[in-house]
Amino acid sequence: MTVIVTGAAGFIGANIVKALNERGESRIIAVDNLTRADKFRNLVDCEIDDYLDKTEFVERFTRGDFGKVRAVFHEGACSDTMETDGRYMMDNNFRYSRAVLDACLAQGAQFLYASSAAIYGGSTRFVEEREVEAPLNVYGYSKFLFDQVIRRVLPSAKSQIAGFRYFNVYGPRETHKGRMASVAFHNFNQFRAEGKVKLFGEYNGYAPGEQTRDFVSVEDVAKVNLFFFDHPEKSGIFNLGTGRAQPFNDIASTVVNTLRALDNLPPLTLAQQVEQGLIEYVAFPDALRGKYQCFTQADQTKLRSAGYDAPFLTVQEGVDRYVRWLSGQV
């Protein structure tokens, strides 16, 4: 049966397509918007049956043009948290997602979709409960509102609906994201260009570079998606993070040491990297004061209760792999 991936040329979508290919799935319809044409590179080493622009997909899917569809991985969205055009964001992320959901429910197709940890906003608890959800931007609100629709639909749904609140995802195939690419990606490019990585200094009680995030490898994101693909009886909204909060220092230090290893140089401690000027701290920008999350950490209780028991890569493991992959691309 056919599998559809929206946002297929994007970061997470392309990694899901590749992961499907690696297990023998190639009857894949890729859906995206290639106005930003450079995204096509993410699919060059992937096998797909067909490609559709997002503007024609929903109408054709709704009228059954693709025959029996097993599942839709709905990864397509505007993920720019700095986007201020609320009308565009709601149409692209909310209304479009509702249309894809409705078509999946009508045809009995599995619906696996990208939610976001941005739903939690400034919360200090990251559990899938309404009372801790307070998005700070229209991107987060578009995801939040769709999750509320899912909560209302789930009790009567006859086919799988699984949403994943992605935390800070990094890994291959994100180059096209520009400023919205991961910290690991930017640290890699900065070190290659300048010979050092710059991090924010002390802020809000956190020592320089010690602001923390739940950084999750896109490898693990794809694995979780495929676990639910294999278990259509499991539905719900799930946090998708490692369950660990690691500081930005860990990302930067791993980037530096991996690049040193590729040059046959020995690893350095964080203190040595700072002392040698390989990591530098800059004053926290006034523009971000009061708008910056210093801590995120996924509560994995629901995900683990659903049966996903595989370990997640640490920053040191995942970023090392990613830097080696990036080094092979340049």
From Swiss-Prot:
Pfam families, A to Z: Epimerase
Cofactor field: NADP(+)
Keywords per UniProt: Carbohydrate metabolism, Isomerase, NADP
Family matches, as InterPro entries: Epimerase_deHydtase, Heptose_epim, NAD(P)-bd_dom_sf
Example of a GO MF term: NADP binding
Catalytic activity: ADP-D-glycero-beta-D-manno-heptose = ADP-L-glycero-beta-D-manno-heptose
Positions annotated to bind NADP(+): 11-12, 32-33, 39, 54, 75-79, 92, 143, 169, 177
GO biological process annotation, one example: ADP-L-glycero-beta-D-manno-heptose biosynthetic process
Residue ranges of coiled coil: none
Positions of the catalytic residues: 139, 177
Binding site for substrate: 168, 179, 186, 200-203, 213, 292
The keyword NADP is annotated on this UniProt entry: yes
Enzyme Commission number(s) of this protein: 5.1.3.20
Cofactor binding note from Swiss-Prot or TrEMBL: Binds 1 NADP(+) per subunit.
Origin superkingdom: Bacteria
Pathway: Nucleotide-sugar biosynthesis; ADP-L-glycero-beta-D-manno-heptose biosynthesis; ADP-L-glycero-beta-D-manno-heptose from D-glycero-beta-D-manno-heptose 7-phosphate: step 4/4
Gene3D superfamilies assigned: NAD(P)-binding Rossmann-like Domain, UDP-galactose 4-epimerase, domain 1
Family stated for the protein in its record: Belongs to the NAD(P)-dependent epimerase/dehydratase family. HldD subfamily.
Function: Catalyzes the interconversion between ADP-D-glycero-beta-D-manno-heptose and ADP-L-glycero-beta-D-manno-heptose via an epimerization at carbon 6 of the heptose.
UniProt subunit comment: Homopentamer.
Entry domain remark: Contains a large N-terminal NADP-binding domain, and a smaller C-terminal substrate-binding domain.
Protein name: ADP-L-glycero-D-manno-heptose-6-epimerase
Organism expressing this protein natively: Burkholderia ambifaria (strain ATCC BAA-244 / DSM 16087 / CCUG 44356 / LMG 19182 / AMMD) (Burkholderia cepacia (strain AMMD))
